[in-house]
């Protein structure tokens, strides 16, 4: 996050529905840079958001580092991703699709109240993930659709 604070995320699964990309869960808790919490405690924390990305690219670009491996990934069946057919047309409100990890995409048209809470189903760059972790929102066009 910055030179005094850090947050953690966890790779949980690859989503064949979304280009076989990595799905991560980002935890809300902010730690001081000197803290070294147990991974088993981190993964019990509240999840801020789920997202698709390429985790290895973030390591190569120096945006994050791998600190360990823990098999506990939590329940994933409740995670809903949403995707708009045309992000250039904000005026079109009935072109949404949703899916759950590794399940079929469903064209739903307008988003229901539950589906509006879904996470954007785009494969974000490491820089996009880093920005959202640091600022709480995506930047650019994606911010309009969160």
Which residues does each predicted region cover?
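Intrinsically disordered, charged low-complexity linkers and terminal tails
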Residues: 14-17, 21, 142-146
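Beta-strand-rich cores of mature extracytoplasmic or soluble domains
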Residues: 42-146
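Short beta-strand-centered aromatic/proline hotspots
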Residues: 5-15
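Short solvent-exposed strand/turn elements
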Residues: 19-45
């Amino acid at each position: 996050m910055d030179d005094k604070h850090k947050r953690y995320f966890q790779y949980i699964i690859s989503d064949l529905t979304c280009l076989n990309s990595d799905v991560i869960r980002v935890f809300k808790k902010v730690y001081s840079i000197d803290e070294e919490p147990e991974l088993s405690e981190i993964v019990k924390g509240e999840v801020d958001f789920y997202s698709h990305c390429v985790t290895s690219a973030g390591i190569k670009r120096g945006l994050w580092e791998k600190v360990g491996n823990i098999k506990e990934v939590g329940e994933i069946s409740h995670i809903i991703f949403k995707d708009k057919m045309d992000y250039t047309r904000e005026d079109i409100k009935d072109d949404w699709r949703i899916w759950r990890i590794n399940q079929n995409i469903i064209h739903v048209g307008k988003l229901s109240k539950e589906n509006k809470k879904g996470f954007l189903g785009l494969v974000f760059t490491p820089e996009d993930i880093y920005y959202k972790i640091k600022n709480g929102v995506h930047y650019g066009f994606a911010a309009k659709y969160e």
